[in-house]
């Protein structure tokens, strides 16, 4: 007999699953869904195991199969990213960042990064992990007209301040950053360049976004669950030498992790193979959809930023909603209509707590099979809420609309036949 308190919690989980999977338009730019096959194999015995150390050199016994899967995952990521070294043990993008900072920035050193209002992630800032590591920060200049790093101004700052590490990439990321140009400057002052690819990893793997390592970055850090639609986790990929890579390995373990949440390896590997097969089509559709949504919002009288530049070249759309009460108010109103976005600071904001913007990502709804026509419908739903229509009225239409898009695309299904094929090939059904 299952205790009542467990049933109550399970009821909450089931309500959440129905709401987010079948009834809402999910536009959080940092989320996605796995394929049915990846989800099934996300549950495995690895989830209760430890494998401290590195492949072939563990501090625990019973890890021979963990080594096989981790080695396969490392090999595939290295091939796809063109990296000499890959570490998949970080459990998140932030942990990947912290380990890299710790390994490459000396005590008392500094990094140059974008402020949060210009797209920098909290882990790039002096209110996040850099503060905990006592690493000083230098602000990279921002070119508001081009919605990107100001290369000329950055050259002056970098040559003057001479940071040990320059961080590109971010959490509000509409256009590729000038990696080649910044890498050239960094080389002249002896600094490393790290590209935080968390938001665009799937676009990189899909071939629609520049590969940072090929553009001159020394290190890629990333999560594995945004435009790359795998389980939550992190990775580090570099083209550095053995000494630097060894320092990164030591920073991952024992400094920042002990357990690597091993169960995610299998689902991450499945997702990586899916992206090799279907990733270009998926990533291309994601970028098309983001641009289509931005254009449709503009036609509805809403104000996406960077119109002169074509709004976006990633999965994201940033919208100035200051005339509707700001990002905090608008995000809450849209949630009442079952449209899920997040408030987000824009470059001209003074507060990240009460920002003027919202951030939208189309990668999950694209994963459910939506295209440009559906983006136009979503823009209409958003505009109805912003014009003052009762969110409950819009919500009814959103739920009805979403019923047509509940099957995950661009990945492997998990029918009985597929599962039997997998196990039969492993001689486990005999």
Curated annotation (Swiss-Prot):
Q: Which cofactors, if any, are listed as required?
A: pyridoxal 5'-phosphate
* Record's keyword annotation contains Transferase: yes
Record flagged with keyword Cytoplasm? yes
Q: In which pathway does it act?
A: Amino-acid biosynthesis; glycine biosynthesis; glycine from L-serine: step 1/1
Annotated TM spans? none
Q: Which residues carry this modification: N6-(pyridoxal phosphate)lysine?
A: 226
The EC code for this enzyme is: 2.1.2.-
Q: Which UniProt keywords apply?
A: Amino-acid biosynthesis, Cytoplasm, One-carbon metabolism, Pyridoxal phosphate, Transferase
Q: Which SUPFAM superfamilies match?
A: PLP-dependent transferases
Name where it's found. Answer: Cytoplasm
* Class of enzymatic activity (EC top level): transferase
Major localization listed first in the record, in broad terms = cytoplasm
Domain of life of the organism encoding this protein: Archaea
**UniProt-recorded Gene Ontology molecular function terms:** glycine hydroxymethyltransferase activity; pyridoxal phosphate binding
Where do the annotations place (6S)-5,6,7,8-tetrahydrofolate binding?
120-122
For this entry, list what GO says about its biological process: glycine biosynthetic process from serine; tetrahydrofolate interconversion
GO terms for CC?
cytoplasm
Q: Where is this site: Plays an important role in substrate specificity?
A: 225
What is the protein's known function? Catalyzes the reversible interconversion of serine and glycine with a modified folate serving as the one-carbon carrier. Also exhibits a pteridine-independent aldolase activity toward beta-hydroxyamino acids, producing glycine and aldehydes, via a retro-aldol mechanism.
Assembly description: Homodimer.
Query: Family per UniProt?
Result: Belongs to the SHMT family.
Q: Which NCBIfam families match?
A: PRK00011.1
Identification of the protein by name: Serine hydroxymethyltransferase
Species, as recorded: Pyrobaculum calidifontis (strain DSM 21063 / JCM 11548 / VA1)
Organism taxonomic ancestry: Archaea, Thermoproteota, Thermoprotei, Thermoproteales, Thermoproteaceae
């Amino acid at each position: 007999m299952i205790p009542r308190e467990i049933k109550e919690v399970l009821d909450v989980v089931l309500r959440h699953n129905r709401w987010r999977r079948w009834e809402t338009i999910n536009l959080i730019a940092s989320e996605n869904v796995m394929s049915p096959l990846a989800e099934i194999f996300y549950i495995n015995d690895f989830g209760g195991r430890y494998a401290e150390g590195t492949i072939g050199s563990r501090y625990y016994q019973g890890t021979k199969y963990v080594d096989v899967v981790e080695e396969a995952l490392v090999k595939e990521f290295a091939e796809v990213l063109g990296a000499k070294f890959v570490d998949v043990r970080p459990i998140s993008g932030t942990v990947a960042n912290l380990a890299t900072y710790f390994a490459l920035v000396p005590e008392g050193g500094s990094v140059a990064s974008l402020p949060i209002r210009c797209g920098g992630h909290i882990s790039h800032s002096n209110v996040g992990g850099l503060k905990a590591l006592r690493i000083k920060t230098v602000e990279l200049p921002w070119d508001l007209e081009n919605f990107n790093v100001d290369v000329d101004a950055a050259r002056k700052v970098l040559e003057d301040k001479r940071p040990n590490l320059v961080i590109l990439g971010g959490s509000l990321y509409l256009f590729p950053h000038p990696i080649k140009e910044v890498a050239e400057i960094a080389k002249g002052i002896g600094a490393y360049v790290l590209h935080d690819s968390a938001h665009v990893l799937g676009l990189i793997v899909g071939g629609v976004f520049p590969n940072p390592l090929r553009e001159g970055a020394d290190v890629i850090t990333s999560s594995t669950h945004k435009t790359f639609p795998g389980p939550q986790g992190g990775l580090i990929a570099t083209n550095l030498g053995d000494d630097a890579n060894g320092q990164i390995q030591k920073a991952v373990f024992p400094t920042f992790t002990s357990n690597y949440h091993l169960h995610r390896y299998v689902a991450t590997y499945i997702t990586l193979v899916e992206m090799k097969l279907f990733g270009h089509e998926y990533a291309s559709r994601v970028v098309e959809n983001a641009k289509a949504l931005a254009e449709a919002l503009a036609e509805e009288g809403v104000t996406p930023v960077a119109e002169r530049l074509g709004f976006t070249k990633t999965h994201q759309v940033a919208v100035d909603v200051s005339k509707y009460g700001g990002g905090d108010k608008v995000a809450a109103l849209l949630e009442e209509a079952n449209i899920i976005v997040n408030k987000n600071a824009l470059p001209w904001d003074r507060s990240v707590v009460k920002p003027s913007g919202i951030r939208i990502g189309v990668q999950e709804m694209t994963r459910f099979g939506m295209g440009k026509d559906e983006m136009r419908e979503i823009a209409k739903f958003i505009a109805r809420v912003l014009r003052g229509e009762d969110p409950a009225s819009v919500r009814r239409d959103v739920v009805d609309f979403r019923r047509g898009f509940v099957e995950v695309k661009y990945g492997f299904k998990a029918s009985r036949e597929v599962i039997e094929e997998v196990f039969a090939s492993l001689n486990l059904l005999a």
